[in-house]
Amino acid sequence: MLKIGITGSIGAGKSFVGKLLRERNFQVLDADRMVHELYRDCVELRAEMAAFFGEACLTPTGVNSALIADRIFADASAREKLEKIVYPYLTRAVDVFFNADANATGVANSADAKGAAGAGNATNAGVKSVRFVEAALFSRAPSLVEMLDEIWIVDAPERVRLQRLVARGLSENDAARRIENQRGACAPELFPGKRICTIMNDGDRSQVESQLDDLLEVLK
């Protein structure tokens, strides 16, 4: 089975590409959503988060994202600590997803690795067995990168990314700060030994679909 990572800097549109893959009935694990589920359900992870960020970081449904975001954007060492806490749990969940029985019952686009085996690739007859993981910054999680055969990088012009973030409700300054914080984090050279493919997403759905279908054709 081929294991492919989908990544891209903030505002590039990796989630849109993941959505298109789900529409084609591919199995895609949303790593960001999985992390939120772990924040909510994993007792051990919640304890580690509280030990470092304080009990105030926890909520009944997960964590106080605003509090944590303020810490990690102001302090690079806090971001590194967060990654060291979270990534081992996420890596285990992704491993379960990749190794789940392809014929097991589940929902193909679920972020829950316990039920992520899904319904297969019925709408893509001829495409070899493949599963996708969508994540923001694979380069900061070497253990995840090691699992992957290919990495598809979704990119967009910086002005387009800035506009998308502002449309989500961020101030222009905050959006620019977040873009700067991730600058270079999805560069192809950060993934030596992996087949790299780039999908440009400037907002034209038909062009994104065309690029995606070309990549899927190679998998047949």
Describe the role of every protein-language-model region.
Residues 33-106, 123-129:
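ATP-dependent small-molecule kinase phosphotransfer cores
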Residues 15:
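Walker A/P-loop
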Residues 95-99, 126-127, 131-164:
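ATP-dependent NMP and nucleoside kinases share a basic, alpha-helical "lid"
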Residues 27, 33, 150, 195-197:
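Well-ordered beta-strand positions
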Residues 6:
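Hydrophobic anchor at the beta1->P-loop junction of P-loop NTPases
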Residues 10:
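The conserved Walker
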Residues 140-146, 166-219:
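Small-molecule kinase domains that catalyze NTP-dependent phosphoryl transfer to phosphate-bearing small molecules
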